[in-house]
């Protein structure tokens, strides 16, 4: 049949394809996904699982007039290939290339941007209601994985759909996985439906009947039979109780069946939910064998699936090993994750202390309140959540943890720039959104050993704590056998100096050392300080240097607005000191995806940029101001 994928410039190009051609296209897409993502890295497993589903959606519906909303949208690679971006697909997640998620500014076919779970149903309902008010006729289709239904936002939307619109299609992509295996009652409920042999036999028969008869008569007959069967096979279908007519489960890899089903659903004048069973990693044996690993990963060998490793432990691994040691010593230590045991490292904790390990699903708000409840009973919860995902639980952090001064520890992985995953996954706001909350202590380690010390310090602290640490590996410092408790709010002076005081926060402490060396070459002596604490800031240290240096330089892997540099300025102002503060950090904008080093250079987070900003202060007679 030739190279079908290269002939597709818009979804309209597949509408004349036969089913055998579409099946051949599906194989081409899988081959392209494997070969391309092997070079760029990305979410290979989820996308291999939705190839037929996405092809069928584009075959039946007409984007951009019809609207597709992908929950999380990490599974939108096939959609990108079918909507005119195949010739740029090799740039996926690369600097200046395609984003790894849906992005409204990237294509008119991307109706809604995403990167976090649970948003698709609410957004799709908003589009459907807007269409109804405007008198439009376009279709709105929300594609959400079964993991998204462990998120409370999805149920808030379900609670409103039937009351607010008559036409909305929800596609439940059920592969039984988020990143790890799905957990909780919803996962068990869906599994029960899928494994009900009588239900499966009924739907196979219904599909054959629909295909054989066709037309409205068949649709009505099948619907009446389904309703009768549902009453016999299970007394109360969850989605029907929310007012959505349920269809399924059906084979999410059967193109002919999917196309017929979508054509049928397209004619319905009521909210419907299609339950499609898919296989994560389908068509690539390494991804099938390692579904957790191949959810999302860096470059890999397209033949074997093998990935390279530096051998040096990541911050996530150091965190997990340290937590195991703390739990060995203290039977009140518990670990909580929101569907991220692999990403946070807690899959290492689980076998050591299974009774004190809790995966609550994609439910960050619940995770925080659950932790608060445990803390009231004398336990020490370590709540491991990516920085970007913890912002979803801001109110529980304030209302349930900090207001009650409960000893919950927030372990914020991916604090700082995350790189290839882009703005939905950068952890650039946590200092701003946490440091204004009373009672919380906020720590930032500069190396692996300091992370272990901070986790120990948090265990001893009788109040809320937060620890932010970056993605990937650190400088390679060995972790002590027994961690040390750090004095709360005290920085560590690494080098004394009387010209400039450099405060290098966390991962940017090595840059502080480089700036010190450059200043020394120019004849200036700079103090280098490891702040360690964002809150409380070491006021005594600031007062000491404010009377000695011509300027402070703060370095942070965080937005400048409300960040660590702002905290330093506020403390100096409270002390009545007018010493200038030069701040290096991220600007007031959403930072695109790309390589961390390249993005830092582009946005002036570099030795060169710091030296340029410091130039006016490299003399004792420089005017006092804040830059």
Swiss-Prot record:
The keyword Magnesium applies. It comes from the Bacteria. Pathway: Metabolic intermediate biosynthesis; 1-deoxy-D-xylulose 5-phosphate biosynthesis; 1-deoxy-D-xylulose 5-phosphate from D-glyceraldehyde 3-phosphate and pyruvate: step 1/1. GO terms for biological process: 1-deoxy-D-xylulose 5-phosphate biosynthetic process; isopentenyl diphosphate biosynthetic process, methylerythritol 4-phosphate pathway; terpenoid biosynthetic process; thiamine biosynthetic process. InterPro entries: Dxylulose-5-P_synthase, THDP-binding, Transketo_C/PFOR_II, Transketolase-like_Pyr-bd, Transketolase_BS, Transketolase_C, Transketolase_CS. GO terms for molecular function: 1-deoxy-D-xylulose-5-phosphate synthase activity; magnesium ion binding; thiamine pyrophosphate binding. Its cofactor is Mg(2+); thiamine diphosphate. It catalyses: D-glyceraldehyde 3-phosphate + pyruvate + H(+) = 1-deoxy-D-xylulose 5-phosphate + CO2. Its EC number is 2.2.1.7. Thiamine diphosphate binds at residues 74, 115-117, 147-148, 175, 284, 364. Binds 1 Mg(2+) ion per subunit. Keywords: Isoprene biosynthesis, Magnesium, Metal-binding, Thiamine biosynthesis, Thiamine pyrophosphate, Transferase. Mg(2+) binds at residues 146, 175. SMART domains: Transket_pyr (SM00861). GO terms for cellular component: cytosol. The keyword Mitochondrion does not apply. Signal peptide: none annotated. Catalyzes the acyloin condensation reaction between C atoms 2 and 3 of pyruvate and glyceraldehyde 3-phosphate to yield 1-deoxy-D-xylulose-5-phosphate (DXP). Homodimer. Belongs to the transketolase family. DXPS subfamily. PANTHER family: 1-D-DEOXYXYLULOSE 5-PHOSPHATE SYNTHASE-RELATED (PTHR43322), 1-DEOXY-D-XYLULOSE-5-PHOSPHATE SYNTHASE, CHLOROPLASTIC (PTHR43322:SF5). This is 1-deoxy-D-xylulose-5-phosphate synthase. It comes from Acidobacterium capsulatum (strain ATCC 51196 / DSM 11244 / BCRC 80197 / JCM 7670 / NBRC 15755 / NCIMB 13165 / 161). The lineage of its organism: Bacteria, Pseudomonadati, Acidobacteriota, Terriglobia, Terriglobales. The gene is dxs.
């Amino acid at each position: 049949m030739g190279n079908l994928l290269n002939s597709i410039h818009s979804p309209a190009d597949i509408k004349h394809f036969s089913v055998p051609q579409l099946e051949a296209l599906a194989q081409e897409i899988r081959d392209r996904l494997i070969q391309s993502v092997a070079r760029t890295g990305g979410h290979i497993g989820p996308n291999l699982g939705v190839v037929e589903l996405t092809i069928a959606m584009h075959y039946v519906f007409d984007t951009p007039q019809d609207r597709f909303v992908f929950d999380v949208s990490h599974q939108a690679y096939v959609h990108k290939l079918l909507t005119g971006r195949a010739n740029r697909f090799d740039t996926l997640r690369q600097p200046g290339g395609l984003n790894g998620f849906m992005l409204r500014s990237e294509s008119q076919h991307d109706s809604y941007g995403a990167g976090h779970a649970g948003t698709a149903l609410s957004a799709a309902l908003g589009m459907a209601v807007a269409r109804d008010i405007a008198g439009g006729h376009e279709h709105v289709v929300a594609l959400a994985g079964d993991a998204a239904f462990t998120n409370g936002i999805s149920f808030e939307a379900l609670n409103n759909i039937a009351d607010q619109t008559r036409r909305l299609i929800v596609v439940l992509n059920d592969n039984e996985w988020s990143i790890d295996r799905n957990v909780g009652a919803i996962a068990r409920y869906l599994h029960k439906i899928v494994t009900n042999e009588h239900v499966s036999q009924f739907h196979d028969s219904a599909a054959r009947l629909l295909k054989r008869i066709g037309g409205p008569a068949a649709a009505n007959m099948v619907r009446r039979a389904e309703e009768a069967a549902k009453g016999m096979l299970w007394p109360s279908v969850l989605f029907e109780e929310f007012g959505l007519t349920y269809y399924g489960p059906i084979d999410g890899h059967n193109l002919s069946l999917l196309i017929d089903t979508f054509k049928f659903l397209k004619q319905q004048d009521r909210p419907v939910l299609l339950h499609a069973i898919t296989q994560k990693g389908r068509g690539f044996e390494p991804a099938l064998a390692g579904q957790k690993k191949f959810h999302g990963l860096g470059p890999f060998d397209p033949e074997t699936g093998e990935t390279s490793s530096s051998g040096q432990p990541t911050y996530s691994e150091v965190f997990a090993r340290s937590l195991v040691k703390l739990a060995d010593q203290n039977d009140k230590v518990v670990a909580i994750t929101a569907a991220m045991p692999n990403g946070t490292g807690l899959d290492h904790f689980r076998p050591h202390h299974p009774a004190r390990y809790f995966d609550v699903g994609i439910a960050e708000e619940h995770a925080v309140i659950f932790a608060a409840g445990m803390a009231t009973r004398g336990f020490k919860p370590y709540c491991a959540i990516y920085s970007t995902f913890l912002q979803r639980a801001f109110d529980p952090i304030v209302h349930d943890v900090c207001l009650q001064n409960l000893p919950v520890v927030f372990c914020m992985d991916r604090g700082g720039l995350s790189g290839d995953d882009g703005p939905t996954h950068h952890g650039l706001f946590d200092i701003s959104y946490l440091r204004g909350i009373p009672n919380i202590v906020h720590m930032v380690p500069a190396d692996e050993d300091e992370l272990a010390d901070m986790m120990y310090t948090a265990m001893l602290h009788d109040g809320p704590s937060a620890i932010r640490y970056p993605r990937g590996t650190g400088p390679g410092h060995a972790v002590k056998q027994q961690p040390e408790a750090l004095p709360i709010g005290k920085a560590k002076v690494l080098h004394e100096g009387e010209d400039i005081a450099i405060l290098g926060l966390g991962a940017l402490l090595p840059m502080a050392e480089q700036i010190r060396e450059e200043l020394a070459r120019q004849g200036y002596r700079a103090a280098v300080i490891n702040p360690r604490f964002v809150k409380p800031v070491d006021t005594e240290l600031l007062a000491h240097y404010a009377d000695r240096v011509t300027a402070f330089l703060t370095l942070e892997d965080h937005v400048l607005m409300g960040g660590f540099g702002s905290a330093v300025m506020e403390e100096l102002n409270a002390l009545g000191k007018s010493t200038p503060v030069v701040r290096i950090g991220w600007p007031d904008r959403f930072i695109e995806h790309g390589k961390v080093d390249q993005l830092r250079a582009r946005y002036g987070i570099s030795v060169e940029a710091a030296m340029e900003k410091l130039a006016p202060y490299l003399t004792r007679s420089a005017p006092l101001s804040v830059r």
